[in-house]
C-alpha cells in the first residue's frame, strides 16, 4: 500500500490539475461510466462533529475507493482545521487497499474545482463581479478556483463573523482584484457569480436579494438540515448538481423539495452540461449549482496525487 502524507499534497496537486480531474469525473458520471455509493453522514454526539463516508467506482478510470472524515467545529483549540479526512483507494481487480492519501487539502481543492466547473459552464456572459458568502478555510480555495476559470473585475464578500473577512481581502489582493465587504442584500444585487461556502443551518441569501442574471455555486450544504439559500430562490432558478439523489436529500435542494416548491425531476446534472447533453444556462435568469460533494471527486484527485507522488518518489510503501 502507498501512503501519501497530508504534508506532501501541496507540492503535488495544483488547482489546475484538480479542475481537470473533476471536469473529467463530471463527464464520466453523465455517461454512466462512474457512480457514487450511498453517503453515510452522521452527527456522532461528540465535539459537535459530523462524520461520514463517501465512495464510488469509476469504471472508465478503474478507480475504486472512499473518503472517511467530516467536520469538527471545535478543532481550533487543537490547532487543526475543522475539516478532517483521509482517502483510501482499492485495487478494483482484487479488493486490496492500494493507497491512503491525506484528504484535507484535497477536499478543499476538489470542492473549489467543482464550483469552478459550474462557473465555467453556467456563469452569465460578461460576468464581472464575484460574490463570496463565507470566509472560512475553504473560501480562499474557492476564490482562486473561480478566478482561474473566469476573468472577474471585483470581489465582494460577506461573512457572519466580519473579523474573518481579511481572508477574502487577502486572497483577492493576491489575485490582483479589489475587494469590498458588503451586506447580503447588496451582494445578491451586485454579484454576477456567487459562491457560498458556509456551515449554515438557516438561509443566508434570500430570493429578494438576487437581481439580474446570476450564477450561484452553493457549496456548503452537504448534510440534512444545513442550508444557505432561501427555498424560494432555489425554486426560481434552473438547478444543477453533482448527484441528484444527494441534492434532494442532503443538499441545498432538500428544503425546496420539502416545501413542495420543486420536484426532483427539475434538478439537472452538471455532468450532462459538461458532456454536451444539456444546454445548461439557456434563457434562465438564475442558475444554481448545488455542490453536495461526491466520493468520485475525492477519488479522482486522490488517484492523480498518487500518480504524481510515485513519479516524484514521495509516496511511502507500507504493508498492512
Swiss-Prot record:
Its EC number is 1.4.1.-. It catalyses: L-aspartate + NAD(+) = iminosuccinate + NADH + H(+). NAD(+) binds at residues 110, 137-138, 159, 199, 219-222, 226, 291. Pfam families: OCD_Mu_crystall. One of its GO terms (biological process) is glycolate catabolic process. The active site is at residue 67. It comes from the Bacteria. InterPro entries: ImmsucRedBhcD, NAD(P)-bd_dom_sf, ODC_Mu_crystall, ODC_N. Disruption phenotype: Abolishes growth on glycolate or glyoxylate, but the deletion mutant strain is still able to grow on acetate, succinate or glucose with comparable growth rates as for the wild type. Keywords: NAD, Nucleotide-binding, Oxidoreductase. It is an enzyme of class 1 (oxidoreductase). Iminosuccinate is a labile compound that spontaneously decays into free ammonia and oxaloacetate in solution. Imine reductase that catalyzes the NADH-dependent reduction of iminosuccinate to L-aspartate. Is essential for the growth of P.denitrificans in the presence of glycolate and glyoxylate since it functions in glyoxylate assimilation via the beta-hydroxyaspartate cycle (BHAC). Thereby BhcD regenerates the amino group donor for the first step of the BHAC. This is Iminosuccinate reductase. The gene is bhcD.
